[in-house]
UniProtKB/Swiss-Prot annotation:
Lineage, top ranks: Bacteria, Bacillati, Bacillota, Bacilli, Lactobacillales
Binding residue positions for NAD(+): 15-16, 37-40, 62-63, 82-86, 101, 161-165, 191
Designated name of the protein: dTDP-glucose 4,6-dehydratase
Sequence similarity: Belongs to the NAD(P)-dependent epimerase/dehydratase family. dTDP-glucose dehydratase subfamily.
Cofactor note: Binds 1 NAD(+) per subunit.
Stored Gene3D superfamilies: NAD(P)-binding Rossmann-like Domain, UDP-galactose 4-epimerase, domain 1
Amino acid sequence: MTEYKNIIVTGGAGFIGSNFVHYVYNNHPDVHVTVLDKLTYAGNRANLEEILGDRVELVVGDIADSELVDKLAAKADAIVHYAAESHNDNSLKDPSPFIYTNFVGTYILLEAARKYDIRFHHVSTDEVYGDLPLREDLPGHGEGPGEKFTAETKYNPSSPYSSTKAASDLIVKAWVRSFGVKATISNCSNNYGPYQHIEKFIPRQITNILSGIKPKLYGEGKNVRDWIHTNDHSTGVWAILTKGRIGETYLIGADGEKNNKEVLELILEKMSQPKNAYDHVTDRAGHDLRYAIDSTKLREELGWKPQFTNFEEGLEDTIKWYTEHEDWWKAEKEAVEANYAKTQKILN
């Protein structure tokens, strides 16, 4: 196992990145973390407020700023790259920030890792693989060969967001082969937990209910996502960073397949609302049907396994967090719903 003393976490003030920083802070006291975050709408200094100090430093800046990245990389022994524009709906309206941050930003970071010969881990998404048929339409009912994503699945991105993440994955692979950069890649399924921006599916529904707004469901809600608690994602990334083989791709998943309708109705039930108290709205353009991850490689090779496997308990904890942290999300709620209203038409 490789040990690190000084790591850079890009996007470490965002949802998944800040949870990773909290994980490192709480479990690896000898590691100093420099968070590099542009603090766009999806980043929040408050996500790190309680741990900023001698062991966690926040640098506000752009991952595509080569001079800043060079300065930070010169003092680091690893870069863990979370920073990304990640909201599919936004990528359909304006793809340009996704190309700039997800592709150009990754290139700048790779060049710094190459220059200083430091470890690089690239955090990516299962959306680079496109989507899968529903379990009921497959001969193996979702468990047969090719019925879940693996590291060998061909890339088939279907949105501007996922295409820029696929492109960034590919340049990481190229920099490993062409320049010997010590890099790994992880592709993860849908995360949930604290600090997630309220434009995302689960926190949007929770905060709608808390705000007296009817939740919204794309289409019929048949689209399936493979949910994983963000804390399990953090331990998976740490396992890859410290034990993963250079040049390899590992998929992080917790066997949490549920369709959107099922998740929304569970949220309503947990919040003491009628299970049908939501509106169907027009579906997202090119909406991927099903995601499902086979994480066998990560589990068998690196000994990782998820701990937060009870989705209902994890969802209850998440609902409790948003209920108790209204000051964290309330100011943005009106603007988020106004943005959705521009493209979503109520069907029922």
